[in-house]
């Protein structure tokens, strides 16, 4: 007998999903997978983690960062911050209970540990959702979410109010990259 849990998330926004990358099924089940590779190893870089409808904002921000600021990024689709947290807790537990063995790495560390740049995670939920994985990364970690109450006439204005739109993601990304002491090319201000 296998315990299986199915959940379905519904949103009130219709949009086309990007094509599923090759060999990402395991990552989907574990909580995240890379949807966009970085294009250069020489430019300043950031890891963008997006979930739900905000993933599209992350993809758009990634394009702006590259075209206007020469900041490269890798974009990760987070299917479950909860699964990433559960895995992190289990790996942490195993490492603490077996100090004489080689430490294992959480799935989030396996994905992001060798990647360059800070991490920026954004979600349509409260920041605490993305913050669940903060302690399982060794990199600078920043999160964006929809904390508080927002009253806006359009979805675009609401995302801007909560600072989870592509413009705010770009601004936060540039600051996060500068805080990690990576050299940014000289460009116009945000």
Enumerate the predicted regions with their spans.
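Single conserved hydrophobic/aromatic residue that forms the stacking wall/gate
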Residues: 181-190
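Thiamine diphosphate
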Residues: 1-182
């Amino acid at each position: 007998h296998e315990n299986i849990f199915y959940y379905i998330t519904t949103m009130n926004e219709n949009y086309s999903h990007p094509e599923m990358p090759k060999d990402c099924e395991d990552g989907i089940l574990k909580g995240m997978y890379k949807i966009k590779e970085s294009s250069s190893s020489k430019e300043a870089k950031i890891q963008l983690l997006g979930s739900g409808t905000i993933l599209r904002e992350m993809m758009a921000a990634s394009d702006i960062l590259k075209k206007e600021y020469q900041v490269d990024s890798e974009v990760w689709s987070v299917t479950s911050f909860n699964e990433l947290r559960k895995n992190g807790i289990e790996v942490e537990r195993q490492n603490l209970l077996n100090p004489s063995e080689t430490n294992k790495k959480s799935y989030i560390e396996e994905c992001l540990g060798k990647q360059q740049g800070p991490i920026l995670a954004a979600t349509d939920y409260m920041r605490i959702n993305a913050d669940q994985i903060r302690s399982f990364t060794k990199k600078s970690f920043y999160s964006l979410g929809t904390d508080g109450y927002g009253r806006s006439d359009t979805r675009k204005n609401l995302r801007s109010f909560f600072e989870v739109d592509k413009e705010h993601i770009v601004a936060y990304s540039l600051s996060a990259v500068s805080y990690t002491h990576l050299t940014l090319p000289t460009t116009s201000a945000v």
